[in-house]
């Protein structure tokens, strides 16, 4: 059973095992269908019935029965198919790290739409092939690298939309899954064995982020990441809602105000 849904910016295609007596296609409201299935008891066997020429989908599960209005399959909008110029594969846990470590810095300002996402691009750093994810809102910046991503060819940097970054979790549940990534001029596609997520990319130019990263710093401090995070969390309890500021006052103390 194939399930396809879209909001014209993102399209998801999933497939599940089913006993199909009569093949066919139809369009039905996704939210209502989801709520019906979600509220059924665990392990329920669900049956979908649609008589030829009928504009209703009958859903039968145990002692429950629902009827939903349908539309012809031709009325369902499908994102235009195209050739993907660049394709490579990464483990699910690697993609999670790229986006989970960078997404907090994405902007929400609609006027600066080119910052509303994560900038993904290949580069060479210290003679090593790198796949880099960058996000910034103009006040903070996150840069995450993975080495030797196995790219057979290079591609120009793309901006993965904020909404797509949020929805990627559905395809990254199993850390050891191989995720195929395909990139074209205006789309990016993530796919595992059963689920495919296709998204438009942001049509804009990401700023030169390297210019704002300080270099030649004369003050450096190396700390245990988890201990530092816990310390910041403790002192931020008394910081103001407006500033949420935490200031290092020495090598051993933090202050919130």
Predicted regions and their residues:
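Structural preference for solvent-exposed beta-strand-turn elements
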Residues: 1-255
């Amino acid at each position: 059973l194939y399930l396809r849904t879209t909001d014209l910016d993102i399209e998801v295609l999933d497939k599940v095992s089913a006993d199909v007596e009569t093949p066919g296609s139809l369009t039905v409201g996704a939210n209502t269908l989801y709520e019906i299935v979600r509220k059924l008891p665990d392990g329920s066997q669900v049956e979908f019935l649609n008589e030829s020429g009928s504009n209703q989908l009958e859903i039968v599960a145990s002692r429950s029965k629902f009827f939903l209005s349908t539309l012809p399959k031709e009325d369902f909008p499908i994102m235009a198919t195209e050739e993907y110029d660049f394709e490579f594969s990464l483990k699910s846990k690697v993609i999670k790290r790229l986006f989970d470590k960078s997404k907090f810095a994405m902007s929400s300002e609609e006027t600066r739409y080119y910052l509303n996402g994560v900038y993904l691009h290949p580069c060479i750093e210290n003679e090593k092939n790198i796949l880099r994810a960058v996000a910034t809102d103009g006040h903070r910046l996150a840069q995450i690298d993975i080495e030797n991503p196995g790219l057979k060819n290079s591609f120009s940097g793309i901006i993965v939309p904020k909404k797509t970054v949020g929805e990627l979790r559905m395809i990254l549940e199993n850390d050891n899954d191989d995720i195929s990534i395909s990139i074209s001029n205006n789309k990016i596609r993530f796919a595992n064995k059963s689920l495919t997520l296709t998204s438009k990319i942001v049509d804009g130019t990401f700023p030169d982020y390297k210019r704002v990263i300080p270099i030649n710093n004369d003050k450096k401090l190396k700390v245990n990441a988890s201990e530092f995070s816990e310390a910041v969390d403790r002192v931020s309890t008394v910081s103001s809602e407006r500033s949420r500021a935490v200031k290092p006052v020495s090598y051993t103390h933090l202050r919130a105000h």
